[in-house]
């Protein structure tokens, strides 16, 4: 019987390995950029087309490779970074496995040009699907250029799994930002479809952060510096008032390598304890330097997770250093960011009871009499006190006495003036409430609605725990989730405006000026046509900020920044699937931002409007995110609970 276990050919093994190393164009960008950094380059250029699906090219001015190394670098497990297993615990480079280039070459058309400084000629190699197509000498500048074209050309299934260009571009942007932030001493430039997105000269940490994020970031940064025997911390955290709803601007770098660590993130959040609103996330850019032998990098395929020898000590040091920096720069705890400090009660008035203001009208005053008569009233009402003060009707003294004597002289005009309304003051208030006028008004009002509407309006609604709305129905009762219900209402409104109707817009007296990073600005430019159909009005675009002169009528000015921030976050996190349209994504994101939140108190009228609005929707049963908006409970079900 023949053997059924066989060795796989190299190109097949490389394709299988590529599934682990290369998941999307961003994976190629990461590997090539890190190789350029390891090559001691001082100038790195990234060029992509169609979000990296058609082309990913990285050009550097590093040390280059010899002819032999240029050929060997595409072999599996061929690397210049380590020689033995012990080297894994003293790594000072990004790559070390020797799998990246072999895996990329197995699933793409790849072209490499490289030359060392001391060589007169360089090497030009073309590979397609792990097969060497050509190798020749060429006149080249110092450094290396890798061009990866037609990614996954021989694995159509993998290519079909790629997301839209917007999502894939965002992943590429993330990888570029991480490498560029980790190495501010290197000049980086980034081009997409022929347009320059970034041109970052070599600078310090602060300048690099501002260059990538936006010019407004500079005023948000609080420096953090701590140097101990086991860790050195440098970087910046943002002031609490600039906290965001998403975690897009949170970066940890350990030994100049971007990592993700929920444990260290918890330390940062602990340092902000009492400074942030619920659900807000602070931005931070923290650079940690630790001895290489105290960490293990080789535990994750993308090397973004690290094991530390003494995590608890690092946690305590990181938390204390951030807390110290926030205190040093006078960032005091503030529990309520929405409170207006101008409305605070002065300290010396806190224990004083408020007095009910008294209003008195001089019934003797007649604007149609001559000045002498009015002067007589004034003199009669004057004295040591004001004629309009109450005096409690029992105050003694000449002032008070003259005041009352003055009024007593004009009793007759007052009585005659009041005689015009004889009988009104003697009516019982209950009689007034049940007057024929009120009955007539009720009759007219009821005639404006049909019987169904009156019956629906008469149904009482109740809010439970500021989360659910309960309303009786014929079969029992309905329980509505107020947050999901409002999401459904807003979602259908926005979608209708974007697809059928042109939404109304309210013009702002003072246009809003909002700053964003280059990547966010590119997303906003792509979203502008759809956002304008919802009621937004944009002025001429700038490089790092947008000017909004009009907003939808159902959005307040203070909510604009939150809405756009949430939309950018959803797009950056890859929430919209490829099957969703851009309009659908925008409508969902805006509905999520503006919907009434759990914990919000609603008046009875607001509850009624919410319930009626939900059942007026085309699909009231589920929220835009496929979650139930309400449940019904029949009387029979309630009876069963009571075992009736």
UniProtKB/Swiss-Prot annotation:
InterPro entries: DNA_mismatch_repair_CS, DNA_mismatch_repair_MutL, DNA_mismatch_S5_2-like, HATPase_C_sf, MutL/Mlh/PMS, MutL/Mlh/Pms-like, MutL_C, MutL_C_dimsub. The keyword DNA repair applies. One of its GO terms (cellular component) is mismatch repair complex. It holds the Pfam family HATPase_c_3. PROSITE patterns: DNA_MISMATCH_REPAIR_1. Keywords: DNA damage, DNA repair. One of its GO terms (molecular function) is ATP-dependent DNA damage sensor activity. It comes from the Bacteria. GO terms for biological process: mismatch repair. Residues 363-405 are annotated as: Disordered. Residues 389-405 have a biased composition (Low complexity). Belongs to the DNA mismatch repair MutL/HexB family. NCBIfam families: mutl. This protein is involved in the repair of mismatches in DNA. It is required for dam-dependent methyl-directed DNA mismatch repair. May act as a 'molecular matchmaker', a protein that promotes the formation of a stable complex between two or more DNA-binding proteins in an ATP-dependent manner without itself being part of a final effector complex. This is DNA mismatch repair protein MutL. The gene is mutL.
